[in-house]
């Protein structure tokens, strides 16, 4: 059986890690052992933050909807309850966009929510 020298494979593996570490500061960008740890940690942060991003955006949308709903005389929870009773199925992302960029449309939705609560 022939002897296998792994120089080519090792070089490719090192190059892959160092390419992923491009743009890092200090030894993290050009020392394989340090770069490998930095890339692994970056992967962990990326994995965690892909999940966190969803939570953070939902919280942002809720804060924006709450602010706009209070301008219309409703709290967030009462506004959302009114939407549910009025059978208006608009998600929080769209409501937040309306609250920021189209206040008259949001005000109309808020009026419908208020009307459904009075019944």
UniProtKB/Swiss-Prot annotation:
Domain of life per record: Bacteria
Keyword Metal-binding in annotation: no
This protein's GO CC annotations: ribonucleoprotein complex; ribosome
InterPro entries membership: Ribosomal_bL20, RIBOSOMAL_L20_CS, Ribosomal_protein_bL20_C
PROSITE patterns (UniProt xref): RIBOSOMAL_L20
Alphabetical GO biological process terms: ribosomal large subunit assembly; translation
GO MF, one example: rRNA binding
Key words of the record: Ribonucleoprotein, Ribosomal protein, RNA-binding, rRNA-binding
Function description: Binds directly to 23S ribosomal RNA and is necessary for the in vitro assembly process of the 50S ribosomal subunit. It is not involved in the protein synthesizing functions of that subunit.
Membership in a protein family: Belongs to the bacterial ribosomal protein bL20 family.
The name this protein goes by in its record: Large ribosomal subunit protein bL20
Organism in which the protein naturally occurs: Nitrosospira multiformis (strain ATCC 25196 / NCIMB 11849 / C 71)
Organismal lineage: Bacteria, Pseudomonadati, Pseudomonadota, Betaproteobacteria, Nitrosomonadales
């Amino acid at each position: 059986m022939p002897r296998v020298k792994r120089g080519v494979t090792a070089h490719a593996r090192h190059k892959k890690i160092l390419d992923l570490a491009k743009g890092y500061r200090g030894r993290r960008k050009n020392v394989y052992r340090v770069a490998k740890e930095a890339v692994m940690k970056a992967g962990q942060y990326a994995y965690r933050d892909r999940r966190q991003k969803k939570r953070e955006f939902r919280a942002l949308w809720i804060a924006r909807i709450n602010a706009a709903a209070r301008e219309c005389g409703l709290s967030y929870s009462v506004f959302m309850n009114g939407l549910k009773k009025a059978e208006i199925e608009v998600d929080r992302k769209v409501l937040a966009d309306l609250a920021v960029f189209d206040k008259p449309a949001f005000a109309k939705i808020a009026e419908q929510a208020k009307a459904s609560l009075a019944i």
